[in-house]
Amino acid sequence: MRIWIDADACPKAAKELVCKFALKRKLEVWMVAGQPQVKPPFACVRLVVVESGMDAADDYLVEQAEPGDLAICSDVPLADRLIKKQVAALDPRGREFDARNMGDKLAMRNLMADLRDQGQMGGGQAPYAERDRQAFANALDRLLTRLQREADLRASQPHR
């Protein structure tokens, strides 16, 4: 299992938490970005800066991630593409994307984009706060535990 991060939009505090969890669990972290980033100084972390272009980082992430991997992203359409590929997805505020909630999340994202385009709504999300970091840490721990159990179960079953 690998952890993928949509690095352009991920808060630094969330990236740091992912690295701590990855070190503890001996997992690889792949940070994918469309812009240069500072790579955390850990051997388990890889940084890929893709050529610029609309959705180039998203496309790379979707192409490279495999079923059973985890992606950290706040981009709802990207999460939808990953979920369809059986890659788990979690946003940096601790909210998990899954097949059950994806339709609602896409509809809400589209509604909010329309309201912003019409000038009826301002800005984006609130600043990343300590409660967001804590919610993310808790959700990340739960999700990694679940994914590891599922991977162990798959590995223990005889191949046909």
From Swiss-Prot:
Membrane-spanning parts: none
InterPro entries: UPF0178 (IPR003791)
Superkingdom of origin: Bacteria
One protein family per Pfam: DUF188
Family the entry assigns: Belongs to the UPF0178 family.
Stored NCBIfam families: PRK00124.1
Name by which UniProt lists this protein: UPF0178 protein PA14_69280
Originating species: Pseudomonas aeruginosa (strain UCBPP-PA14)
